[in-house]
Amino acid sequence: ALGGAKLPAQIREQIALLRAGRFVLGVSCAPVYGELAWAERGQGAWLDGKRIQVSPTAQLSATILSTGNLQALAQGPRWARFGALVPQLSRLRGYGDFVHYHLLARGALDVVVESDVNILDIAA
């Protein structure tokens, strides 16, 4: 619930503030997880009032990776390299634009691979 209002789980939003060509604020609202995350440039990132950070995982064998638009990736020259990487991972998922970026911000995923990223995907 946000501000006392209960939101349907499928509703989700990511909002970013761009000032003078620089991102200064990002907000990710994920009612499906009951979470609200935000980050301010130079001030860190927060999830429901507690400090968060991306995952510290440093070994491929422990890495959880989420992908987006594998069809576009499969049509490019990096497909074979991606295929060689997959067996080395702990897990491979395909959560999709909103969900995998939200999970990445709170450290629940280690890596996101998108073959056609645009600013709307990553701004928040």
Task: Cite the ranges covered by each PLM segment.
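N-terminal subdomain of lithium-sensitive/metallo-dependent phosphomonoesterases centered on the IMPase/IPPase/PAP
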Residues: 1-11, 80, 84
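A generic structural signal for short coil/turn motifs at secondary-structure boundaries
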Residues: 3-4, 73-75, 114
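Acidic beta-strand-loop-alpha-helix segment within the catalytic core
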Residues: 14-102
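Short secondary-structure boundary segments
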Residues: 69, 115-117
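Glycine- and other small-residue-rich loops at beta-strand/loop junctions that grip anionic moieties
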Residues: 93, 114-115
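Hydrophobic residues within well-ordered alpha-helices
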Residues: 102-105, 123-124
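Alpha-to-beta junction loops
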Residues: 106-111
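Acidic donor-binding loop at a coil-to-helix junction in glycosyltransferase catalytic cores
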Residues: 120
